[in-house]
């Protein structure tokens, strides 16, 4: 957590330390409003309002004092710190990027070992098949996917990860900061569809994992990978499988029976439950 705290001005970092950081999933910073720590059970509001200089301080530290080098990420509305932490950025959209930044959402990653273990008997019952992980934003899709990758890799599967935003592996100095298992190869930074084709050509995966599939070209890459006999693991924002079917791109893929199973994540009263659905 020291890597997270170092992003904040000292007075803010000190105030944050008085609260349970191990339970904190997001820190919200909005100019003129109190800092808010978001946990699975609710929000904790600090007495300190975020100043414009605070946001500048956070972004400078997060970018290693090179905002220019992070322009591509900022144009997409986020900044990746290199330790698995992703900072969502909100401000004024211009032709050249994002300016006058007014709020930040600092997502704090957590590795929860064996959270996917109870699901393995159902997911592997007929051999591993392509699986969606489905939930609303912030319910723990990435955490579950990360642990599922690790467990499959430990179990002997060759897993390749297209980690476009660096959240799954948090590769730093060529080494993942999260344990993804001994048989996992990670492609970081490139688009998911480009990474998919490169991994298929070079790493001979049995399993391909993606986080947050949204673009049409990503769907095309998954179709191609499935045609090569590779099992897919992917996450999607939706309340459940039924709501996923209302979106044309997902509905097409589901109708093609490329994905045979889904895991729904439900969050109620701070507790996560998982439900495996056969598609």
Give a label for each model feature.
Residues 94-100, 260-279:
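Conserved P-loop NTPase
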Residues 67-128:
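P-loop NTP-binding catalytic core
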Residues 133:
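Hydrophobic anchor at the beta1->P-loop junction of P-loop NTPases
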Residues 152-197:
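P-loop NTPase switch/communication element
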Residues 141:
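Conserved lysine of the Walker
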Residues 1-83:
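N-terminal accessory targeting/assembly segments
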Residues 144, 148:
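Hydrophobic positions on the alpha1 helix immediately C-terminal to the Walker A/P-loop
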Residues 203-261, 267:
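Conserved P-loop NTPase nucleotide-binding/switch module
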């Amino acid at each position: 957590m020291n890597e997270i705290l170092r992003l904040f001005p000292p007075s803010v970092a000190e105030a944050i330390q008085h609260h349970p950081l191990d339970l904190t999933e997001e820190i919200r910073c909005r100019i003129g409003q109190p800092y808010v720590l978001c946990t699975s059970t609710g929000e904790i509001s600090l007495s300190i309002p975020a100043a414009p200089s605070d946001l500048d301080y956070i972004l400078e530290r997060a970018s290693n004092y090179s905002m220019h080098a992070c322009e591509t990420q900022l144009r997409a509305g986020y900044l990746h710190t290199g330790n698995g932490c992703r900072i969502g950025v909100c401000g004024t959209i211009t032709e050249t990027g994002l300016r006058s930044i007014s709020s930040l959402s600092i997502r704090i990653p957590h590795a929860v070992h064996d959270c996917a273990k109870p699901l393995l008997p159902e997911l592997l019952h007929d051999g591993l098949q392509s699986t969606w992980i489905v939930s609303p934003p912030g319910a723990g899709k990435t955490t579950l996917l990360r642990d599922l990758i690790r467990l499959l890799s430990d179990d002997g599967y060759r897993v390749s990860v297209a980690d476009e935003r660096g959240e799954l592996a948090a590769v730093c100095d060529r080494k993942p900061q999260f344990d993804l298992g001994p048989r996992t190869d990670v492609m970081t930074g490139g688009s998911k569809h480009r990474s998919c084709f490169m991994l298929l050509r070079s790493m001979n995966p049995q399993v391909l994992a993606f986080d947050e599939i949204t673009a049409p070209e990503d769907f095309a890459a998954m179709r191609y990978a499935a045609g090569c006999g590779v099992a897919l693991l992917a996450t999607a924002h939706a309340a459940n499988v039924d709501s996923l079917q209302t979106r044309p791109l997902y509905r097409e893929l589901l109708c093609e029976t490329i994905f045979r199973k889904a895991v729904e994540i439900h969050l109620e009263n701070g507790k996560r439950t998982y439900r495996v659905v056969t598609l």
